[in-house]
Amino acid sequence: MLEESKALFLELYKEKKKNEWLDAWTDEVMSLVQQQYSNYKLDGILQEAARHDLLPVIENYITRGGNLHIVVLDECGEKVNILNVAAANNSVTVINYLLDNNIFNVDQRVSENSRTALHSAVKENAMESTKFLLKKEQILILNLNINISDLKVK
């Protein structure tokens, strides 16, 4: 499952970046990207798929019996889940899939003292994710350790 997930990730990542970078995406750049991700384990590939909103990688993993309830480390070294990663990076397509398919619930945490997806979105100033998560579920704002006055949700 790892090699298949890596191949799908690289294919989709290449297409996404080609559209963003247009002519800057060369064979040399693709070779560097493949090198970068070649040593990744499955949890790293899934984390990157969530970060880059590459839903087909997540879907493929799930349909093959994979379990997304893995713990990964974010950029600060804190333990988070795939929903946190997606939320912190405005990967709304992945967030919607994970919530609509009841893979995660909106206030799920890795541990009692860890962050929810909304915490991660707000911490990273990921406004699309923040708005989406606030609209998706009724969340008790009083339980959050954030300054609500900083949010400008329409």
From Swiss-Prot:
**Superkingdom:** Bacteria
The protein's UniProt keywords, in alphabetical order, are: ANK repeat, Repeat
Q: Which Pfam families match?
A: Ank_2
Repeat as UniProt keyword: yes
Spans of the ANK repeats are 78-108, 113-142
Question: Has keyword Cytoplasm?
Answer: no
Tell me which species this is from: Rickettsia bellii (strain RML369-C)
Instruction: State what protein this is by name.
Output: Putative ankyrin repeat protein RBE_1220
Organism taxonomic ancestry? Bacteria, Pseudomonadati, Pseudomonadota, Alphaproteobacteria, Rickettsiales
